[in-house]
UniProtKB/Swiss-Prot annotation:
Function: Involved in targeting and insertion of nascent membrane proteins into the cytoplasmic membrane. Acts as a receptor for the complex formed by the signal recognition particle (SRP) and the ribosome-nascent chain (RNC).
Lineage of the organism: Bacteria, Bacillati, Actinomycetota, Actinomycetes, Bifidobacteriales
Region of interest (Disordered), ranges: 28-118
Protein name: Signal recognition particle receptor FtsY
Gene Ontology biological-process annotations: SRP-dependent cotranslational protein targeting to membrane
Pfam families: SRP54, SRP54_N
Record's compositionally biased regions (Low complexity): 63-104
Gene name of the encoded protein: ftsY
Transmembrane segments: none
Length: 420
């Protein structure tokens, strides 16, 4: 709009200037001619030339005036429109000063129960377990002048308690020749005699110490846990770690049961409760021997007192089981000697567990037995039969679901419990 007004003003000025120049030149011409209009040819020619020059100048001014709006329009078209002024962005709210992330406070490790306290508590627990084995024997043997039928009842009671055929026959023979039993029965004498005979059968003088606790034990002392899935093997491994922690030993565990998805997690949970590190694979189905090898290398590097290695308990293929356990032992012994192989047996399975026990004994060779769930079994005679069949002692027993319900096997406490 301003450009158009400028063009109009310029045109008016040019026209006014042209008129003024025309009048001025006319005055000059009149002055030169003495204001007398000469009537000769020369004067007429000069006037015509002046008029022509004035007309030409007027045409030039008109042409310039007409060209000016077009030029203005072109420049207006060429000139970019002024950019709209961007509204300033609102200032960002000041960020709060970053505070360092608070680390979760690690749970305080539990303090396991001492071994002495366990033994006292577990003896009482066994006495209250209601095992009918000892009571049934005592009720028969407390009779006066036992008949042949009574002796058959004694043998049947022993067999039902899973003492085993050979051990049952041996005990009956010993009792038959004891004057305290065959004559007029004194209940106190009968009880004392029965306790003595059962202790002999269980093995009162058998060395039941774990090899890791013996003088001159290797350090780290390696314990391999074997057993059928479902016997409480992994749980027993965790409880055994607590037992060693209670004795102020530095413990490490290896999760070589890589075929049961929850086994490594379960072992880690047990380890975390007493601050025991667990070596495991991040991949399900990994080679168990590689886990055992890594665990033994790390235990050696850390100079741990004890390394407990949990293994798989699949019995679907005896050949594969033997190969797997044999390989675990061989690769572990490249780093550390294996001091102990503990077989975990469920006491409630009775004689059915004996076939399983023999498979593991053949596969890897065992040095001791852990009887789990002994409190839930009326078949306490498994202690006798497993020792007689395998030729190795029962070293540990489990009497409950509590984390400290695992203790060294005490023959006298066991016999007292079943005769209570």
């Amino acid at each position: 709009m301003l450009a158009v007004l400028g063009v109009i003003v310029a045109a008016v000025i040019v026209i006014a200037l042209s008129i003024w120049l025309g009048k001025s030149r006319k005055r000059d011409l009149d002055r030169a001619m003495g204001k007398v209009a000469p009537d000769n040819k020369k004067t007429r020619d000069a006037k015509a030339a002046a008029d022509a020059r004035l007309a030409a100048e007027a045409e030039e001014a008109k042409a310039a005036t007409a060209a000016e709006p077009a030029k203005s329009a072109e420049s207006a078209k060429a000139e970019p429109a002024p950019a709209a002024q961007a509204e300033p962005e609102p200032a960002a709210a000041p960020k709060p000063e970053s505070q360092p992330a608070s680390k979760p406070t690690p749970a305080k490790p539990e303090t396991p129960e001492s071994v002495g306290s366990r033994l006292t508590r577990l003896k009482a627990k066994l006495a209250k377990s209601g095992n009918p084995f000892g009571k049934a024997l005592f009720d028969i043997l407390a009779k006066d002048n036992l008949s042949e039928a009574d002796w058959e009842d004694v043998e049947d009671t022993l067999l039902l308690a899973d003492v085993g055929a050979d051990a049952s026959a041996q005990l009956v023979d010993d009792l038959r020749t004891d004057a305290r039993i065959t004559g007029k029965a004194d209940p106190a004498e009968v009880r004392a005699t029965l306790k003595e005979k059962l202790l002999d059968l269980v093995g009162r003088d058998t060395d039941r110490r774990l090899n890791a606790e013996k003088p001159g034990a290797a350090k780290p002392s390696v314990i391999i846990m074997v057993g059928v899935n479902g016997t409480g093997k992994t749980t027993t491994a965790g409880k055994l770690a607590r037992l060693f922690v209670a004795e102020n030993k530095q413990v490490m565990m290896g999760a070589a049961d890589t075929f049961r998805a929850a086994a490594a997690d379960q072992l880690e949970t047990w380890g975390a409760r007493v601050n025991v590190p667990v070596v495991r694979s991040d991949k399900d189905g990994a080679d168990p021997a590689s886990v055992a090898f890594e665990a033994s290398a790390k235990a050696k590097e850390a100079n741990a007192d004890v390394l407990i290695i949990d293994t798989a308990g699949r019995l679907q293929n005896k050949s594969n089981l033997m190969d797997e356990l044999g390989k675990i032992r061989r690769v572990t012994e490249k780093n550390l000697p294996v001091d102990e192989v503990l077989l975990v047996l469920d006491a409630t399975t009775g004689q059915n567990g004996m076939a399983q026990a023999k498979v593991f004994a053949e596969a890897i060779g065992i040095t001791g037995v852990v009887l789990s769930k002994l409190d839930g079994s009326a078949k306490g005679g498994i202690v006798v039969s497993v020792q007689k069949e395998l030729g190795v002692p029962v070293k540990l027993v489990g009497l409950g679901e509590g984390p400290d319900d695992l203790a060294p096997f005490d023959p006298e406490g066991f016999v007292d419990g079943i005769l209570a």
